[in-house]
Amino acid sequence: MLLIITNEEDIHPNPVIDQLVKLNVPFFRLNTESLLSHYDITYAISNASHSFTIKYKDGSHAISSHDISSVWERRPIEPLTTFDDLAPNVSKLVLEEGDGFLRYFRYSLTHVPW
């Protein structure tokens, strides 16, 4: 499965996605700014291995680390928080954790073509 890492405002992946749909090529689009608001992430780490699953909160799409055959990264941006009721220091921590996850996430995919 192709993992497309981008942002919601980037329209350039859309024609590619249209072709992927026509050709029945499985893909998952990850809009990085929405990481903290639109996705559920499950991550498991042990001494022997690691794995993750990312799902749209609406349940429409999901991807597992075991499913990824290649990655296309195009214009990702830092995660944004939509949790307005958080204290500023907590909001800062949440954003740092989201950004840290994206960095480790990329590193965990070095075994597949980019």
Residue ranges, per PLM feature:
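Conserved N-proximal alpha/beta basic substrate-recognition cap immediately N-terminal to
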Residues: N7-Q19, L30-W114
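Short phosphate-binding/catalytic loops that engage adenosine nucleotides
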Residues: V25
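Extreme N-terminal starter segment of soluble prokaryotic enzymes
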Residues: M1-L3
